[in-house]
């Protein structure tokens, strides 16, 4: 756990300095690589949660739609917000990354729920550590494999944790 946290903190120190546009370009490659494995992922979903294979396409299609949408609005939504009230001073709100985001994803829609946290967090300059349900461990591994090919090292990590260790991470 400590090694993963430390490597994510170290990676975030440089990831956050890429422009939003640069991060979005890399994340689009991440999504593309992940979805290129859709047949393998569909079979794994069936084995892990017992969902009919005919329904796997819906989850992966939803993953793509959500990721594409969030990445398409990232530059606008992460831009500085001008709150200037007079001409003597320029006032603005600057959005800054938080650091490392720990995401816990459930078993029932493991990709569809994870995408809602991991893509915006990374687009904003944070690194992500994903903990999937013990019932769907291969989901985190598939995302990690795509991250290894397309993102800087340790921007996306995963941990397989039991309940006790998961609580330790979130309480620390």
Summary of predicted features, one role per range:
Residues 82-172:
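Rossmann-like NAD(P) dinucleotide-binding subdomain of oxidoreductase/dehydrogenase enzymes
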Residues 1-89:
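N-terminal Rossmann-like NAD(P)+-binding subdomain of aldehyde/semialdehyde dehydrogenases
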């Amino acid at each position: 756990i400590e090694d993963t946290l430390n490597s994510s903190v170290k990676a975030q120190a440089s990831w956050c300095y890429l422009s939003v546009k640069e991060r979005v370009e890399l994340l689009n490659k991440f999504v593309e690589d992940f979805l290129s494995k859709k047949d393998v992922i569909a079979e794994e979903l069936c084995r892990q949660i017992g969902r009919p294979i005919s329904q796997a396409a819906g989850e992966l299609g939803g993953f793509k739609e959500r990721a594409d949408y969030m990445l398409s609005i990232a530059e606008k939504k992460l831009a500085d917000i001008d709150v200037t009230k007079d001409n003597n001073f320029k006032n603005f709100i600057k959005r800054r990354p938080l650091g490392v985001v720990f995401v816990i994803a459930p078993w029932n829609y493991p990709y569809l729920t994870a995408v809602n946290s991991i893509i915006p967090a990374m687009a904003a300059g944070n690194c992500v550590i994903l903990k999937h349900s013990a019932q769907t461990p291969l989901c985190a591994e598939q995302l990690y494999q795509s991250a290894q090919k397309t993102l800087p090292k340790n921007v996306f990590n995963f941990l397989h944790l039991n309940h006790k260790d998961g609580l330790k991470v979130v309480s620390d």
